[in-house]
Amino acid sequence: MTGPTWTRAALVPVRRGAAHPEIAALPNGLPTVDELFTFMRDAERRFETLRMRIEERVYAGRGAQIQVHDVALRHPNQARVVTTFPSNKAAGHSELWISDGEIVRTYSAQHKLGTSRPVRPRVRGLDPKSYPGRSTVYDPITALPAETLPEMFVHPAGYCQNVLSTGVCWISGTDRVAGREAIVVECDHPRAVERYVDRPDYHVQITVDRLDGVITRMVESVGGEVTRVAEVVNLAPDAALPATTFEFEFPEGTTLLY
């Protein structure tokens, strides 16, 4: 088991001017939690393109609410996330987020609303080695929408440092997710979470793809009762992506918001 010790989200090694994975591949057997978190931090550096589908179920008083997130990514900077809501009976209920690294466009099919805005510039000149680990953030090759499952699954460094490392973590074994071997991590009472689950019986289980380091499943539970499950049902690193994948024009009748 480990407590809040891993603070290396921003410390990606640089060799000959280029960042590279600190751990190229996991050794046989089970790694330590710190080794696994370091391996996960560099996940996106193990592929040039990615296709991923995440199915999310949130269990509440009205039953399971389902969302599906379809992710397409090409380094550097090109990314597209389409979120659909199968549990919503409204026809055509989907949301799009697409970026080329300079402009981010969003579109809600249900409301016919869109936005087109410059990417927010990141703070520059902050050497991670000059600040405490918990005060640093991971700088991705290709950005994804902030505070979303696609961002967390593909860029897990921040989640490992700011959430999992605030609880008690241990590796409980292996599993298979999306047809691929995965390592299972358990975490009791991570404190950096929403207030309504900030309680001692809150538990998170994740699985980590053994080859690439992305998160492939997350299960949240309170008092032994599952409240949320998000699982990758399709994972294709280095997938062949059509040239049109990252092209988008707002449909006629779209209202653009600033």
State what each model feature region is.
Residues 94-103, 131-138, 257-258:
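Short secondary-structure transition/capping segments
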Residues 2-30, 109-119, 124-126, 131, ...:
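Non-transmembrane domains of secretory- and envelope-associated proteins
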Residues 36-43, 155-158, 171-174, 216-221:
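Intrinsically disordered, low-complexity boundary segments flanking structured domains
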Residues 2-119, 184, 196, 203:
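N-terminal mature ectodomain segment of secretory-pathway/periplasmic proteins
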Residues 52-55, 153-156, 186-191:
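Short Pro/Gly-enriched beta-strand edge/turn motifs at strand-loop
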Residues 125-177:
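Solvent-exposed helix/loop surface patches that form functional interfaces
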